[in-house]
Each structure stands twice: as structure tokens, then as C-alpha cells.
């Protein structure tokens, strides 16, 4: 499609003009049939945005052997494997620009449930029940169970920085905001900005990622595009 758009004005208008054109509708019908029957993509305003989200979804080739990506293309299912922590990265990482995505658990959290970012070098599986995301210098994570921020195997304080921060509720969508210009990672809950969690991120390609420990739990990640200011 991209190559056609370069040589044909009609295709260019279809791809870069109307984001709900028949081209994008057709791609959604063909690639996202399962997801379109649910509310997974309800916060995406156009068919083009839905297709883009699928391009940025979890990678079936870059996750622990103990998880699989469901037919909807956006949800990770962790198999009930004892003494293992399992993660997944998305298909596409970011080295520039500003990006936002939503993550939510659709099952129990267990003792550790971490959302954040990772380089391509960060491991996506380890023994035991640990905070895999944030366990080394290649990943940064927020543990939704105890509200700790994790990087390089250390706790970098609690988050959000307020008294009696509410615990995560299953099904609650958390918005993650990665700013590769300012080198920061921030979070929102229910459109409430919770603050910047990490600063001084490296000039590297960083991927949205999660890690989970509870058997048969499921995690969904949906890429939203450029975050809205304000």
C-alpha cells in the first residue's frame, strides 16, 4: 500500500486522507475480525488507527515460550507454568517521537504484574516469580501490585507519589506515555495524569512491554499513537 501511494494520487488520498476510507475498513475486516467484535479498540477514533495499533501489538516472536498471543492480536495469555515469570514485547519499538498506549490486566495480577518498556536485549523469561521488567539496566517497569518503580534490579520509589495511592483494579486501563524527546516515561489512570515515573531514558530503541506471573491471566496492550496534550 505504501509503495502504491507513492506513485498514485488516488491511493495517496486513500491512505493519507480519509482515515475511515474503504481501504482501511477492508484492512480492519481482514486483519482484525476478532478484535472488532470486542471493545478492545474502543478508544481508537478511526479504522486507520486500528490497523496501526495492530502493527504495534505484542509480537508472537518476541515473548516468553510460556505465553501466546490470542487470535484478537492484542491480548497475551500466560500459561499456568510454575516458578516462571513471563513477558512480551511489541513488534515495533521507538527511538524518537512521543507515543502512548493502553495496558490492562484481564485476570488476577498475582504477586508481580509489571508494565513499562524494554530494549531488545532485555530477557522475556526467568525462573521464579520476580519483577522481570525492571530487573536489569535494559528495562523500566511499574509493578501494579505494590506500586513500586523498578529499574536495574532496584526499587526506584513508589508510584504515584501520593499518600494511599489506590490499588490497580482488574480491567482498569492504564495509559503509558513515552517521550523520546524528553527521555521520560509517564502514566495515566482514567485520564488522570499520575506523573513522570522515569527520566533520563537512554537514546535507544525502546519497546512497550509487560511481565506476568499468574497462570491463565491475560494482558491486553493497544497502541494509541501520539499522546494528546492537556
Curated annotation (Swiss-Prot):
One of its GO terms (biological process) is protein ubiquitination. Component of E3 ubiquitin ligase complex consisting of FBXO45, MYCBP2 and SKP1. Functions in substrate recognition but plays also an important role in assembly of the complex. Required for normal neuromuscular synaptogenesis, axon pathfinding and neuronal migration. Regulates neuron migration during brain development through interaction with N-cadherin/CDH2 after secretion via a non-classical mechanism. Plays a role in the regulation of neurotransmission at mature neurons. May control synaptic activity by controlling UNC13A via ubiquitin dependent pathway. Signal peptide: none annotated. It holds the Pfam family SPRY. PANTHER family: F-BOX_SPRY DOMAIN-CONTAINING PROTEIN 1 (PTHR12245:SF7), SPRY DOMAIN CONTAINING SOCS BOX PROTEIN (PTHR12245). InterPro entries: B30.2/SPRY, B30.2/SPRY_sf, ConA-like_dom_sf, FBXO45-Fsn/SPSB_families, SPRY_dom, SPRY_FBXO45. It comes from Rattus norvegicus. This is F-box/SPRY domain-containing protein 1. It is found in: Secreted; Postsynaptic cell membrane; Presynaptic cell membrane; Nucleus. One of its GO terms (molecular function) is ubiquitin-like ligase-substrate adaptor activity.
